[in-house]
Amino acid sequence: MQATADRALERAWEVLEAVPDPEIPVVSIRELGILREVRRAEDGHLEVVITPTYSGCPAMSQIAEDVGHALEAAALGPYRIATTLTPAWTTDWITDEAREKLRAYGIAPPTGNCGGGAGQAASEQPIAFIPKLPAPACPHCGSKHTERLAQFGSTACKALYRCIDCREPFDYFKPY
């Protein structure tokens, strides 16, 4: 029985690995760090834990719906989707593979490190002012000669930048 349950959890992770972020479809919710945990609850239900990139993220209902559809399509039995806000999501949770996919898609990945490693409780994170980070490199030509045009880009978690060298605009995934 335990081996079957473990295989179901493995299968759930595999299935959910393919669920794309609805706002940036080239990366999965797992690669972005939104998919936090998949576990078996005491009542036998599969429990999927997700964390929004910020507390007001409008894509969370779509993400939950997509997770549900993926689990149903894989016939993984009864499930529950839980949203947790603690610890708060951080761009540190974005995988290296996702950063490369973002760059190839034309979105500059976040620069620097926010210091909130996966699983670190919010109370364990030092409180500090956000340092001025270097300008992001252009995802089109690689130049570091970029300028911010607007604090918000195509979504609230991105800023709009332009490359001074190739003149192309691009979104920058803000670090937080």
Summary of predicted features, one role per range:
Residues 1-176:
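Domain-level signature for proteins that mediate thiol-based redox and metal-cofactor handling
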